[in-house]
Design a protein with these regions (language model features):
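C-terminal catalytic "cap/lid" subdomain
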Residues: 1-54, 58-254
Length: 254
């Protein structure tokens, strides 16, 4: 499954030079997204077709993860596509997404998709090789190759955002930890390097990246859904200490 942004940027580029009326941020995002999504998916269609691969477009919103019914319907759609040899290309539907319920960025979306689809691995492509043990511009700074469960990275994470994204390395790390805790391997690598995906698959030991070691033991589908639904709570549940122990215990089944 491929998660890709770029619709807004494509739409802005496509309409550059046109005399547009004064638009607020929401109107502009909706316009550029509607125009750009066509251009973006056509580009992917052409690139994959040249290699004999079929692709399909899936537009989603954060609200689609809120209810179990929509969550499973979305999952089923992508499962059918994969079973039929079609690669889902997923993007947020910026034309109708409510600002207050937008994904932080596509790193968050990719984490939710990886969890929903019970993927073996999530590869997050950035513009650097991974998480460094210092400033990437400082001589001698190296990429942290592996992040074990519980390792503190707070001293190494910078909060700067990319010029085109809504998040940054902090968001990537937060999502990576969450997904790794669910038993899924997470890799942060440099998407600007040629053949990076092939190298990660065929030469994992030699390819520079940051790999988050997954927790042992699986997590149920329901627990994964709940783990990514913290923003959709509609009430409160009060538990006593004994109930908390039972729910955290190994015998808990949901």
């Amino acid at each position: 499954v491929m998660i890709s942004s770029g619709a807004v940027a494509c739409g802005r580029s496509e309409l550059r030079g046109m005399q547009l009326p004064q638009l607020d941020n929401v109107d502009a995002r909706q316009l550029f997204s509607a125009v750009g999504q066509v251009k973006l998916i056509n580009r992917y269609y052409d690139l994959f077709r040249d290699r004999g691969i079929h692709v399909g477009q899936v537009l989603t919103m954060k609200e689609s993860f809120a209810t179990r019914r929509h969550y499973l319907n979305q999952r089923n759609c992508m499962m059918v596509m994969l079973q039929c040899g079609v690669i889902p290309i997923v993007n947020e539907n910026d034309t109708i997404s409510v600002t207050e319920l937008m994904f932080t960025d596509n790193d968050e979306l990719s984490g939710m998709i990886a969890s929903m689809m019970d993927m073996q691995a999530l590869i997050i492509l950035s513009n650097i090789d991974g998480i460094y043990n210092g400033s990437p511009s400082t001589p001698g700074t190296q990429v942290i190759r592996e992040v074990e469960q519980g390792k503190d990275l707070s001293d190494y994470i910078q909060t700067e955002k990319s010029g085109f994204g809504r998040g940054g390395m902090l968001t990537k790390t937060t999502i990576a930890r969450k997904v790794a805790d669910e038993g899924i391997t997470v890799i942060i690598a440099n998407g600007k390097k040629d053949h990076i995906l092939v190298d990660l698959l065929q030469h994992p030991a030699e390819t520079v990246c940051t790999r988050f070691i997954p927790a042992e033991g699986g997590v149920s589908s329901v627990k994964k859904w709940i783990a990514h639904s913290e923003g959709f709570a509609k009430g409160e549940l009060h538990l006593n200490e004994q109930a908390v122990k039972v729910l955290k215990g190994q015998k808990a089944v949901s």
